[in-house]
């Protein structure tokens, strides 16, 4: 091994660039990415579990399926 095998923590590059927290806008941290804290991560999870977030469905797709069955 060259260099003794030890790495200096200041030379380690982050895995990804810091982005604003998806919940509050503060800089995200690696442990809770893309959030800044466990609190923001749990707030977002609660919104998904309570149904506050929903993936929209186009009405045209359901009408097209009905016509195919005829």
From Swiss-Prot:
The keyword DNA-binding does not apply. One of its GO terms (molecular function) is DNA topoisomerase type II (double strand cut, ATP-hydrolyzing) inhibitor activity. Its cofactor is Zn(2+). InterPro entries: DNA_gyrase_inhibitor_YacG, Znf_NHR/GATA. Keywords: Metal-binding, Zinc. GO terms for biological process: regulation of DNA-templated transcription. Zn(2+) binds at residues 21, 24, 36, 40. Binds 1 zinc ion. Interacts with GyrB. Belongs to the DNA gyrase inhibitor YacG family. Inhibits all the catalytic activities of DNA gyrase by preventing its interaction with DNA. Acts by binding directly to the C-terminal domain of GyrB, which probably disrupts DNA binding by the gyrase. This is DNA gyrase inhibitor YacG.
């Amino acid at each position: 091994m060259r260099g003794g095998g030890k790495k200096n923590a200041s030379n380690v590059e982050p895995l990804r660039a810091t982005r604003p927290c998806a919940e509050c806008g503060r800089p995200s941290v690696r442990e809770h990415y893309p959030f800044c804290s466990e609190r923001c991560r749990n707030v977002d999870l609660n919104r998904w579990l309570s149904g506050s977030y929903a993936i929209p469905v186009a009405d045209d797709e359901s009408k097209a399926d009905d016509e195919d069955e005829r």
